[in-house]
A protein has these predicted regions:
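Hydrophobic beta-strand scaffold residues
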Residues: 62-63, 114, 176, 208
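Glycine-rich phosphate-binding active-site loops on the catalytic face of alpha/beta enzymes
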Residues: 85-100, 190-223
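N-terminal basic/disordered segments at the start of proteins
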Residues: 9, 13-21
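Alpha-helix N-cap and loop-to-helix initiation/capping positions
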Residues: 23, 130-141, 188-195, 219-223
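Conserved anion-binding
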Residues: 12-13, 70, 74-156, 160-165, ...
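Conserved, mostly hydrophobic/aromatic
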Residues: 15, 38, 67, 90, ...
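Metabolite-binding pocket within alpha/beta catalytic cores that recognizes anionic/polar moieties
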Residues: 37-89
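Acidic (Asp/Glu)-rich catalytic clusters
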Residues: 4-7, 26-33, 51-59, 80-84, ...
Length: 228
């Protein structure tokens, strides 16, 4: 039994596959039958490529997280290739600008959507200062990038659990996927702006991204069902 969705609804959790390809199949077997999707990021994609993405997309809801950020023509071409892989959602950096974002909504379908990345959940005020951002408040930066993406037709967003409530209130019909989710008592690892799964869902998150608290848990199947 696969975890593929029977409609355009996204699964409540995407399990982050930040691992080598050899570790993927055992984990899929452990989580078989659960209503989860899988996030394929740079580590796994650069090891195994588009073939793995296409194979997994036949049976599972896939979130391809490559955070496209380049000149508009390059991003448009890459995005068109991704749209044909069968994935459900994929990411672009909102900081790429309006010209980069504006052409993407035309590539969306009922079962495929772009998500604008605002501020990474690992970033703090000091990190923004290091980038030369004049307003180093992460929430203000998130709001600015949210406005930019929304004004260019993007309705899906990646944001931390701390910002999702306010953004969801501004765009109730939007898609909001939140990384930086840690069950109560779990290690924060390299995340800074975090919340529990229950807090994130109550704040308006459409789906959660959870990696190490599931993949490195003694019982990954039980961890994948922990929504507290």
């Amino acid at each position: 039994m696969s975890s593929q969705q029977t409609s355009s609804a996204l699964p409540p959790v995407f399990v982050a596959l930040d691992m080598n390809e050899g570790a993927v199949s055992p984990l899929l077997g452990t989580l078989d039958g659960l209503n989860v999707g899988y996030k394929i990021g740079m580590e796994l994609f650069y090891q195994s490529g588009a073939d793995l993405v296409r194979r997994m997309a036949q049976d599972h809801a896939i979130f391809l997280d490559l955070k496209l950020h380049d000149i508009p023509n390059t991003v448009q071409s890459a995005a068109a290739r991704i749209a044909d892989m069968g994935v459900r959602v994929t990411t672009v950096h909102a900081a790429g600008g309006g010209a980069m974002l504006a052409g993407l909504p035309a590539l969306e379908r009922d079962d495929f959507q772009f998500l604008a990345v605002t501020v990474l959940t690992s970033m703090k005020a000091e990190d923004l200062r290091g980038l030369g951002v004049s307003d180093d408040n992460p929430q203000n930066r998130v709001q600015h990038l949210f406005n930019l993406a929304r004004d260019n037709g993007i309705t899906g967003f990646i944001c931390s659990p701390l910002e999702v409530e306010g953004l969801h209130a501004e765009l109730p019909s939007g898609t909001f996927i939140t990384p930086g989710v840690r069950p109560a008592g779990a290690s924060l690892d390299d995340q800074n702006r975090v919340a529990t799964p229950l807090q994130a869902k109550q704040s308006g998150a459409t789906s959660l991204v959870i990696g190490r608290p599931i993949t490195r848990a003694p019982d990954p199947r039980a961890a994948a069902q922990d929504r507290k």
